[in-house]
Amino acid sequence: MRNPERVSLRPLLGGLILLLALTVIGATRFNSAEQREILDRTGSQLSAYTSTAAAMVTVWTGVQRDAVAEMARYDMLRLLAAEIAETDLPVALLRELGETPWTEQEHGRHSGLDARDRQALRDISPHATLIYRKFVEFISRHDFAGAALLDMTLEPVRLVGQGWQADTRTLLKQRRSKGALSGAGMLPVRLQGERLLVDFYCPVTAPGYVSADDSPQGILLVTCDIGKLLGG
């Protein structure tokens, strides 16, 4: 004979399970709404902080712009930009060698080069290696996040540190279409991971190293971590 108490508990147990399920669903919806609220609030704070930081960075450029412009006038930097502009070296190769000093061993291992390319790299290598060291020193002295030398197509041919993104090239192309790359400038503040970054650019120009229409042969791009800038 079945125990009547056990039978009578089944409906009660089922009701408890249903109640628990409804409670979990309700809590999940509440958490989702709460998360959305947190995200909205965080986004507003980030937007306000970005605006404030951008204003402070604008003031800061008045102090540090001379340092960036001085680096852009570095003779060897102009020479390398001009030499690269005169070659047809593959962009993929320049990117591959962009973050390390160029050496004969690296040139010899690269299978995508013909004799002309190898000769061009041998000619450029001393300048590129020297500029790499100059960039490292420049970044360290001014506490930048990174620096890059871009060629006439706005492709990076010399990269040191962090900060470069493909979107940066798109923004620079938009500036160039408006004729805004003829002088120093600042790109919009952006979020990369948990860091707020801002990019400063300056044309690499000098007599004898520019094209017939006086357009720059290269662009110096410097990335700054706003958190460090503001002492955060």
Where are the language model's segments positioned?
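Intrinsically disordered, low-complexity acidic Ser/Thr-rich regulatory segments
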Residues: 106-137
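Short, conserved clusters of charged catalytic residues that mark active-site
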Residues: 52, 63, 130-133, 224, ...
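Short regulatory/linker helices and ligand/cofactor-binding micro-motifs at input modules
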Residues: 2-6, 52-54, 118-122
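Extracytoplasmic/periplasmic ligand-binding sensor regions of membrane-associated signaling proteins
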Residues: 128-223
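Short beta-strands and strand-coil junctions in structured, solvent-facing domains, enriched
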Residues: 206-207, 227-231
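Long, flexible, surface-exposed domains enriched in hydrophobic/aromatic residues
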Residues: 19, 99-102, 116
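Extreme N-terminal signal-anchor transmembrane helix of membrane signaling/transducer proteins, especially
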Residues: 2-36
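Membrane-proximal amphipathic alpha-helices
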Residues: 31-47, 53-111, 123-124, 141-146
